[in-house]
Regions:
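Histidine-/acidic- and/or cysteine-rich, low-complexity loops and terminal segments associated
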Residues: 1-18, 315-317
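Conserved residues at the C-terminal ends of beta-strands
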Residues: 11, 35, 345-348
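Non-globular, low-confidence helical/coil segments that flank catalytic cores
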Residues: 18, 25, 144, 194, ...
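Hydrophobic alpha-helical transmembrane segments in multi-pass membrane proteins
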Residues: 20-174, 235-274
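Alpha-helical transmembrane segments of multi-pass integral membrane proteins
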Residues: 133-230
């Protein structure tokens, strides 16, 4: 329960949450722990309702939200997505809504946080906000929420592929279900428990989060691996975004909608299958890995790299989480090239420098055969 409390309320996930972090990431719903509009909206609304109950007028309340926003932003480490959400909330108080609200928010962000768009979190936060702004007026009710979840997931796809090169189709349904669950159940529950923890720690609700984690593990076993789409070049990314904008404009014209949709599918196909022969040598730490792919898509990988381990006694407190060379270089590169299967994995040596990261590679990709 502690990790969910710090994660959902303050945006901090400890290292002992690593297993669940990987499961949430593989299912494409780790963004639920990224502080954004859901948390900001919940806390701002709760703050307003509390002060209104105490008898404050709307005019006084409007100005009290500014110091509250500053304190909350500080507690979350001035997260880019939180700053964006708070700015939009504060501007909405003054009657600035819709695209005007979004445009002014981006302008202010450029002034106070010039490096905002240099981070994946900043770009994704603004992209989500823009799509929500464009689709928020189209219908109400459960059907509209489900359609909105689908539109957001598909609309953000080019940017997700640019930064992460993969997409989990299950995330569309899971985001719809778990965002509702987190917003309606867990945020209020954890907020109350957090306040009570200063008086008396309440641990009786641990079973709820154990139950949630068991469900996540079950869904992870049933769900397929994320789709590896590949990383588009800058020009292909721009072309994808323009095409998606045209799809939105022509959404009521079936023929044009179908035409642009097929064009987008074709672009994603070219990203994943470049239709060219490729030989790449990768620096994987203490050795090199060679990747080969022909025009038909057959792939061969020679060696996976690794780290030489030395027998050095360390105490428990000195142990730390480490990332393998393959997770830093080899796996991200292969995914950026649209690779989801390695037909032949050739290991030229049994030394750690050649085969040390074999387990990480076999977890990340389907491997046809291993040759030693």
């Amino acid at each position: 329960m502690r990790n969910y409390m710090t994660g959902l309320l303050l945006g901090h996930l400890d290292t002992d949450f690593e297993e669940m972090n990987e499961l949430y990431s593989s299912l494409g719903i780790i963004h639920l722990f990224a502080l954004s509009g859901m948390q900001v909206g919940f806390f701002m609304d709760a703050f307003k309702k509390l002060l209104l109950r105490l008898g404050l007028t709307q005019e006084k309340l409007k100005w009290l939200t500014y110091p509250f926003s500053l304190i909350y932003a500080g507690l979350t480490g001035f997260s880019a997505s939180v700053i964006r959400s708070l700015l939009q909330k504060l501007l909405a108080q003054h009657g600035i809504k819709g695209l005007d609200n979004f445009a002014l928010t981006v302008l202010v962000l450029f002034i106070i946080m010039p490096n905002f768009f240099l981070t994946a979190g900043g770009v994704l936060s603004c992209a989500y906000a823009f799509i929500l702004t464009m689709t928020s007026k189209e219908g109400e009710g459960l059907k509209a929420v489900a359609r909105e979840s689908l539109v957001i997931s598909l609309g953000i796809l080019p940017i997700l592929s640019f930064y992460f090169a993969e997409f989990q189709p299950w995330s569309i349904l899971l985001t719809f279900v778990f965002s509702f669950l987190f917003d309606v159940v867990f945020l209020p529950l954890l907020s109350i428990l957090f306040i009570l923890s200063f008086i008396y720690p309440v641990t009786q609700f641990n079973f709820v989060f154990e139950w949630l984690e068991n469900i996540i593990r079950l869904v992870s076993q049933l769900a397929s691996r994320p789709l590896v789409l590949g990383q588009p070049t800058t020009w292909l990314l721009i072309l994808l975004l323009v095409s998606l904008a045209l799809v939105y404009d022509f959404r009521k014209n079936v023929k044009r909608l179908a035409g642009f949709s097929l064009f987008i599918v074709g672009l994603f196909f070219l990203i994943k299958h470049p239709l060219e022969n490729e030989i790449t040598m990768l620096d994987v730490g203490q050795g090199e890995s060679i990747f080969l792919r022909d025009v038909t898509g057959k792939t061969i990988l020679i060696d996976v790299g690794g780290k030489a381990e030395f027998d050095k006694k360390i105490q428990a407190w000195q142990e730390k989480a480490t990332t393998s060379n393959a997770q830093r270089t080899l796996i991200p590169y292969l995914k950026s090239r649209g690779v989801d299967k390695i037909d032949q994995l050739i290991l030229t040596n049994t030394d750690k420098e050649h085969v040390g990261d074999l387990l990480e590679v076999t977890k990340a990709f389907h491997v046809g055969e291993i040759l030693v």
